[in-house]
UniProtKB/Swiss-Prot annotation:
GO BP of this protein: L-proline biosynthetic process
Its EC number(s): 1.2.1.41
Organism taxonomic ancestry: Bacteria, Pseudomonadati, Pseudomonadota, Betaproteobacteria, Burkholderiales
Cross-referenced PROSITE patterns: PROA
Pathway: Amino-acid biosynthesis; L-proline biosynthesis; L-glutamate 5-semialdehyde from L-glutamate: step 2/2
Domain of life: Bacteria
Enzyme class: oxidoreductase
Protein name as it appears in the record: Gamma-glutamyl phosphate reductase
Amino acid sequence: MDIKQYMKEVGQRARKASRAMAKADTAAKNQALLFIAAAIRREADALRAANQLDLEAARAGGLAPALLDRLTLSDKAIATMAEGLEQIVALPDPIGEISNMKYRPTGIQVGQMRVPLGVIGIIYEARPNVTVDAAGLCIKSGNATILRGGSEAIHCNQALAKLVNEGLAAAGLPADAVQIVETTDRAAVGELITMPQYVDVIVPRGGKGLIERLMREATVPMIKHLDGICHVYIDDKADLKKALDICFNAKCHRYGTCNTMETLLVARSVAATVLPELAKLYATKEVELRGDDEARAILQGYPHLASATEEDWSTEYLAAILSVKIVGSLDEAIDHINTYSSQHTDAIVTEDYTRAMRFLREVDSASVMINASTRFADGFEYGLGAEIGISNDKLHARGPVGLDGLTSLKYVVFGHGEVRA
């Protein structure tokens, strides 16, 4: 296969489809999403069978446990994909919305209209759910998309893409509005990220190695996050039960996600009370605790205890490992977070309103939480219907990227024959 020519043809079809999608009406887009959701439920057995082929190959190839977890398409995951599409249907269509209208002294009226970005290239690894989430959001926001999933999920991605294409066609929309890259050749990624004439933005969802490569090589703008180094700070005004529940969930709910807590900060005055209780919970999951000197002194006897190094504070483990640091004040906690955080998601546990609001204002992250698990940093949980990714950049989109993040604004001007003096 001539990869360059193949990707050029994919890009040309996507660009053509994007023009049709930009003017598609809300009813047709919603109808397509409902067709796809129904097909996912109807074809659940076929999807599980395709996923099983991927899982068998992945296990034989020694795929890491965290990636196997992401690759697995459970009954719950299938149901969640369909529900996510139905949530997107229920959301208002942002396309064509005009806002910020104002009259100018010259007599013209100026406002902004929300429009699609155009063609969105999405690169992801062993996450078949992204195929549906991304397709749904792109359809509703009037964009075309080119999906390049990881080779580990090729069978499942192809099965899902077929259902998406059929749903689009049934609703009278171009099937090429959602295309999956059929080859697992990595050269296809290199072509996709260097086709600005066909692709308007790239959304990568993958490991650090993938993101770093794209940052070096891409000539198409990106919406991305590099790491998910998330913190929870237990303040000395925290409710103990809330702290235990939140910190156990934030670490142990799922290890392989970017919104999992990787560093726990504890106020010195409550550390001797809260850490032993947390250790009992973490021991049930055999979580390795990498503590500073003070934390290790409190945690003596914990069966999975190690010393934290400077590198640990800036490491995304994606595993049953947690770094633990004792801090003397809220100022020290905020300073540590702003120094080592990846600006993804950080949380405080406290009953002190003033401290909580300071934390919200001063922590420079895409999501900042009070008395809630970092695991809530997710488009589905935020009511976005689904998310196409999470951005910890500051330009265009920040945090979970839903419908609005896949649109742009253009200025619109209404006049009555005015000319500029």
